Amino acid sequence: MTERVNALDIIDLTAAYGRIEVLHGVTFSVPRGAVVALLGPNGAGKTTTLNCIAGVLNPTGGHIHINGHHLNGSASDRLARAGLCTIPEGRGIFPNLSVQENVSLFSFAATAPPKEIEERTYTQFPRLGERRSQLAGRLSGGEQQMLAMARALSTDPALLLLDELSMGLAPKIVEDLYEIVGDIGRQGVSVLVVEQFARRALAVAQLGIVMVHGRVTAMGEPADIADELSAAYLGGAA
């Protein structure tokens, strides 16, 4: 029987900014088709971990495997071929392009025809369909986050990385966005969401990972990490 390969395996990952080591042997996995929440207070090392996975920062040690491929410090095109797509904290949309142009921008990397991608996008994100000719820079913060997600999904990713999905958004918008994240997971896309505010992320995640000071301190189903998560936030992180 063939062993099931995880969407992501992080093994003994270390990273540094200059001479300051900020990740200390980080190890965890994202199973295929799962939504996983990477949690912890500000400065815990969550975004640094994400940047190592996304190829933005070269780790100083350890291993990153995406769908079974060893991809430490790989170029973005190689990561994309492995099925990885990242939505950074700043969302990465093009404000002077229309919603439609933003959605179409990455469709070259998809296996489906452009028309099918368009129909699928506006079915999943009807609010964007109503604004498809509008400049992306004129959308609300929540709509811009939806656009970033829609554009990422247009590439048919196997693994989606989300950084601070709720940053600067109203609670109702955050709730709507996480409902979409849950839907994405149910469609078979693996999702790793980095989040400082844990409650909403854990509502849709099958697995939660707690980080403090560059180390994983707890990992498990959301109900099983509650005490460690509380301790992480009460203790804080520099």
Regions found by a protein language model. Name each.
Residues G18, S74-S76, V99-E116, Q124-G129, ...:
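ABC-type ATPase nucleotide-binding domains, specifically the catalytic core motifs of the NBD
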Residues A152-L153:
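ABC ATPase C-loop
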Residues G62-L71, A82, P114-E116, R120-T123, ...:
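Conserved ABC transporter NBD signature motif
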Residues L39-P41:
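The feature captures the beta-strand-to-loop junction immediately N-terminal to the Walker
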